[in-house]
Regions:
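Short glycine-rich anion-binding loops that position phosphate/pyrophosphate groups of nucleotides
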Residues: 55-62, 118, 154-158, 174-177
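ADP-ribose/adenylate-binding Rossmann-like module
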Residues: 76, 82, 163-195
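NAD(P)-binding Rossmann-fold cofactor-contacting core
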Residues: 113, 127-144
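Structural motif
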Residues: 52, 109, 149-151, 168
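Glycine-rich adenosine-cofactor-binding loop
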Residues: 8, 94-99, 104-129
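Phosphate/diphosphate ligand-binding glycine-rich loop within oxidoreductases
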Residues: 2-102
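Rossmann-like NAD(P)-binding element
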Residues: 143-163, 170, 174
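Active-site capping/gating segments
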Residues: 102, 187-220
Length: 220
């Protein structure tokens, strides 16, 4: 029986299995491939009955290196959050990009905090809508920073976040959010929204079948 899964670390508390089960009413198994060893993960992906897997930190950039076919979205982001096995090859895709384009909307300026796989997708999304983003890493927040839209992809709180001023802040981290109570933001989009959007956009790439969107939106 074909199966699907999520690769990354740490992922024991991931909500992805719940979303996938809701999307397809539990018709396919969805396993957690939790490991710090990417080669071991890919070996399982190639040799077991996986049709496709979601990919999260710290493997989004590494995923491109094992792929035979790289979608335009993944190429533009320099990272993939979906790997699909098809005709003996591995395809890399990125559903974060379109999800971010939707969430960012019509922005006058974009600040991206964090340069990992999610940060790279945010940079590409900003450029897609015609805005050259500013990138700051976790140790570059000492001075007050202002932007129309901020995308924070940090896994944990970093000193200086409290000084951000923006119309809209989009946070990737849904497990332990660190931006939801910042005083200088007018609108906050939580990581669960990001998670659900990229899932809805990516599941059909993984399975070949449309997900139950209403069920995904109501799952968490």
């Amino acid at each position: 029986m074909i199966k699907f899964g999520l690769a990354g670390y740490p992922i024991a508390d991931s909500l992805s299995p719940r979303l996938f089960d809701a999307a397809y009413h539990g018709n396919w198994p969805y396993e957690l491939l939790e490991s710090t060893d990417f080669e071991a993960v890919i070996k399982r992906f190639r040799t077991e009955d996986f049709k496709a897997i979601n990919v999260t930190a710290p493997f989004k950039t590494l995923a491109l290196g094992v792929s035979d076919v790289i979608s335009e979205e993944a190429r533009r982001c320099g990272a993939a959050n979906i790997l699909v096995r098809k005709d003996g090859r591995i395809e890399a895709h990125n559903s974060d990009l379109m999800a971010l384009i939707v969430m960012i909307g019509l922005a006058k300026s974009v600040l991206v905090i964090g340069g990992g796989g999610a940060g790279k997708a945010a940079i590409s999304a900003a450029r897609t809508i015609g805005v050259e983003p500013v990138l700051r890493h976790h140790d570059e927040l000492a001075e007050p920073l202002e932007a129309d839209v901020v995308v924070c992809t940090l896994p944990r709180y970093a000193p200086g976040l409290e000084h951000i001023r923006c119309r809209k802040l989009i946070e990737a981290n849904y497990k332990t959010p660190c931006c939801d109570a910042l005083p200088g933001i007018k609108e906050y989009i939580p990581g669960t929204t990001w998670l659900k959007l990229q899932a809805i956009l990516g599941y059909e790439l993984m399975t070949g079948e449309k997900p139950d969107v209403k069920a995904v939106l109501g799952a968490i």
